[in-house]
């Protein structure tokens, strides 16, 4: 591959990563405020990794987190800053990166097939729930008082299971269609 082709591919990678970091931000702004805000962030993360693949998708999620950490209002409710990441629901936001990295690992181990992507999205969601709920319990205990696991799951996980399953199905459909339209070399 020529030097100009390599430079072009790197430039395209950077553009796609930036665009999909913005997609995640836009999805986070579509929000219904609850104890843990209902947003389309998980949808955005899953579409990002589904279209760009694990490596590029993980970079896009990292860029999204980095922008939010330095104060750019990319999180739910047009918020940003370390206070959000360290707050009660920050673990779910950090869990997005863990989800993307896990999806990348599953992709590396099992290849890029639709059923593998679906499986990795489910595993990614479980990891996000686990990190976010553990973080929520610790942050809530420091800020308000102790909270039991059953209560935390009732507030932070159970109400989101069905909507998140719907988001996974939609993310699979969108990822497959967008990947075909973009004709990306995802390997």
Model-derived features: where do they sit?
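Membrane-embedded alpha-helical hairpins and interfacial helices in multi-pass inner-membrane proteins
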Residues: 112-187
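Hydrophobic transmembrane alpha-helices
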Residues: 1-60, 70
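Membrane-helix interfacial "entry" motifs
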Residues: 5, 9, 13, 34, ...
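Hydrophobic alpha-helical transmembrane segments
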Residues: 14-19, 43, 47, 58-63, ...
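Pore-lining transmembrane helices
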Residues: 41-43, 56-57, 64-65, 158, ...
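Interfacial aromatic-anchored transmembrane helix boundaries in multi-pass membrane proteins
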Residues: 28-40, 65-99
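Alpha-helical membrane-inserting segments
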Residues: 23, 27, 31, 48, ...
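Short helix-perturbing small/polar motifs within transmembrane alpha-helices
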Residues: 1-4, 19, 26, 82-130
């Amino acid at each position: 591959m020529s030097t100009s082709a390599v430079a072009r591919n790197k430039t395209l990678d950077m553009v796609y990563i930036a665009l999909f970091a913005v997609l995640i931000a836009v999805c986070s702004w579509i929000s219904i405020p609850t104890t843990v805000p209902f947003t389309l962030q998980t949808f955005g993360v899953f579409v990002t990794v589904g279209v760009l693949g694990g490596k590029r998708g993980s970079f896009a999620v990292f860029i999204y987190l980095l922008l939010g950490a330095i104060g750019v209002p990319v999180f739910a409710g047009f918020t940003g800053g370390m206070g959000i990441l360290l707050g009660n629901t920050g673990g779910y936001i950090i869990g997005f990166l863990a989800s993307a990295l896990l999806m990348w690992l599953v992709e590396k181990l099992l290849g890029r097939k639709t059923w593998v992507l679906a499986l990795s999205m489910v595993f990614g969601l479980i990891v996000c729930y686990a990190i976010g709920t553990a973080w929520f319990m610790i942050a809530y205990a420091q800020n308000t008082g102790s909270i039991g696991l059953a209560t935390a799951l009732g507030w932070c996980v159970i109400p989101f299971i069905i909507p998140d399953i719907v988001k996974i199905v939609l993310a699979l459909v969108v990822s497959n269609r967008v990947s075909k339209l973009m004709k990306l070399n995802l390997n």
